[in-house]
Structures are given as C-alpha cells and as structure tokens.
C-alpha cells in the first residue's frame, strides 16, 4: 500500500494507522506533572521502574492481536521502534531517572490533513518519546511527497512549568475539583505545552482540552500553527485529573458525540455543537468499578473507542455497557480485548495514531464561521 498521510477527523474510514508497543515500559520516577496525576490512594504512589515482564508480554500480545485484527479488515498497520526507556531523560534543565514507553502514540502524534505534528509533551519522562516514531516519519517523508513532518518547539520543562503548591500538601478531591473548575492546573503558562491526545479533529475545527497536559499557551501555539483551522478550547470541571480528552469527549460520527457523564462539557461551550445540529449524549457507564493495577487511567477508558468508519467502532471486549450503547446507536461493534494493556498508556484510541483516513477538511460548524 502506497503511503499517503491524510486524516482530518476522528470517524471517516480508517486505512492506515500506527499501533503502539509495550516493550520495556517503565513506571517513571516522581516528577511534578506526573505526581499531580496520580491519586493519593493509588497503588502507583512511590513505585517506579520497569514493569514486570509478564505484564509487558501480555500487553504486547493484546496489542499484536489488535494490529492483526485491523490488518484483517484491510487497514495498514505500522508499529513504533522502542528506545531504551531505562535510560534517564536528561537535558540542561532537568534529570529524571527513567522514561515511560511507546504504547500510546496518540499522545505524541497529531495528524491534521497531510501533516503529522509531534507534540511538546508535558512530562519530563516523555521528552524523548518522539524518537520511537522517527523511523516511521522518515519512511513516510520518503514515500509521500505531500507529507509534512512537523515538531512543536521542545519545552524546557524547568520547575517554572509546574505549580509547586499542587504537591505541597495532601490535596483532597473537593479541592482538586475546585481547582480544575477554576482552570488552576499543575502546569503554568511558562511556555507552550500540549499533548496530542488533548486534541480532537472535526475537519476545519480542532477542539482542544485545557488541563494538566495542555496549557493556554499550547492552545494558542496550535491556533497560530494551523491558521486555516478554528481552534476551540474546552474544559471539563468534573474531572479532578484532566489529562487527555479521549476518555471524556468522543465523537462517533458527524453530529454525534459521547460525553463522560461525570465530566460534562459546560453549557456555554456546548453552543457551537448545538447550533450546528450536533447531539451530545452521556456515555454508558463503565463495566468496571476500578482501573487495572498500576494504571494511570480511570475506569472511563470504557469510552476510549476507535472509530473505523461512521458505522463501525472498536470497543474493549469487557466494556459490555459501552458496546450495548454503540449497538443501539446503530454502530457495528468490533470487540477488542485490551484491558490488560490499559496500564501501559490507555485504551483503543490511545494506543493508535491515524496516518490515513478517507477524509477531507469539511466544515462541520458553518454557522459559527470565522
């Protein structure tokens, strides 16, 4: 299959995708951005180092099976090249004793049209993660003359990028919710920061979550970088750990979005969707009461689905309520076992990154042009 980089939204027919790997994945050491994400009662507090080999093997088995399933449906699948994540991440501004992994390419790579943009990232342990994808980027650049490989300015990630008061006391859930409602996050506005997984693509419009991993300067950088797009900042006050939008707000097809019922989009931010005949409905409840062991993510990875086309969606096999909801919405559900890989970086949307969808830059919000 000839390489063509082209993807403008989250739902048009998927023809080429990157699926991550779990090789050598580490629980990184404590650092400012990471500590604020890990709840006080989490089993990950105080733990760091290489994940147990049997869990790595199991995660890779599931990721390989997912890749094979996609290939059997006629979708080209590429995989990253893991680096040695046991090595420290060191720059003139910071040092952390190990890195993370390359299971979730969605965090690092943002595909907009014929461009793949490497995000800044906001964790020190993930500063060099882009290297896992460089062999693929080089290959695409050679094979597709229209492909644009871009990288956002690498942040310094000094202590000035983080609020020390996020870590200075044992912070209860009520205080966290108050802070996030006030858009008071662990990251400051020292320099532009964004993770690619905070961005959803709606043709001419990009919806970007302001939270722990993406700040306002990062959103403004995206606005200037994509001058032909409209960039909309959103936030979800019900989320005490707002990191990455794709377990909170999930477009399924033109006109339909699932919203996490515990993290509803504020009323004034819904107007652009309602005025353009988009329906926002509550996602089904997760099938699990707790996340898997040693997992950063919440139980709401249930709604972290991968849409293959406007009528077909991949849902994690154990998430029976989400699958039932998708079925009632008229979607063909493809069950994919992945829960034992969640701890390595997320769900079905997280562990993939688009290369090619049969799509174009359509205007889905024409009543609010400009």
Give the role of each language-model region:
Residues 1-370:
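The feature marks the mature, well-folded catalytic cores of soluble enzymes
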């Amino acid at each position: 299959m000839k390489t063509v980089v082209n993807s403008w939204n989250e739902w048009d027919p998927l023809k080429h995708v990157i699926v991550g790997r779990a090789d050598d994945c580490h629980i990184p050491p404590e650092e400012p951005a990471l500590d604020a994400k890990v709840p006080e009662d989490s089993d990950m507090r105080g733990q760091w180092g290489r994940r147990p080999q049997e869990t790595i093997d199991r995660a890779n088995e599931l990721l390989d099976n997912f890749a094979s399933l996609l290939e059997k449906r006629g979708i080209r699948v590429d995989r990253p090249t893991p680096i040695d994540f046991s090595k420290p991440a060191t720059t003139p501004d910071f040092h952390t004793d190990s890195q993370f992994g390359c299971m979730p390419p969605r965090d690092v790579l943002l595909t907009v049209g014929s461009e793949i943009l490497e995000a800044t990232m906001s964790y020190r342990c993930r500063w060099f993660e882009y290297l896992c994808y460089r062999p693929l980027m080089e290959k695409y650049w050679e094979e597709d003359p229209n492909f644009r490989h871009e990288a956002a300015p690498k942040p310094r990630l000094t202590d000035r990028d983080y609020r020390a008061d996020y870590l200075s006391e044992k912070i209860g859930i009520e205080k966290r919710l108050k802070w996030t409602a006030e858009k008071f996050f662990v990251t400051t506005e020292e320099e532009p920061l964004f993770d690619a997984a905070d961005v959803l693509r709606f043709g001419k419009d990009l919806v970007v979550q302001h939270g722990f991993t993406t700040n306002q300067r990062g959103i403004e950088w995206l606005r200037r970088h994509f001058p032909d797009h409209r960039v909309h900042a959103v936030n979800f006050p019900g989320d005490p750990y707002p990191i990455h939008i794709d377990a909170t707000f999930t477009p399924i097809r033109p006109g339909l979005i699932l919203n996490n019922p515990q993290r509803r989009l504020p009323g004034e931010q819904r107007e652009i969707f309602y005025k353009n005949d988009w329906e926002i409905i509550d996602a089904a409840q997760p099938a699990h009461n707790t996340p898997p062991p040693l997992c950063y993510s919440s139980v709401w990875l249930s709604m972290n689905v991968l849409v293959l086309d406007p009528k077909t969606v991949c849902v994690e096999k154990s998430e029976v309520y989400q699958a039932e909801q998708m079925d009632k919405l008229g979607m063909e559900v493809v069950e994919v076992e992945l829960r034992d890989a969640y701890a390595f970086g997320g769900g079905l949307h997280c562990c993939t990154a688009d290369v090619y969808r049969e799509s174009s830059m359509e205007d889905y919000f024409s009543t609010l042009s400009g």
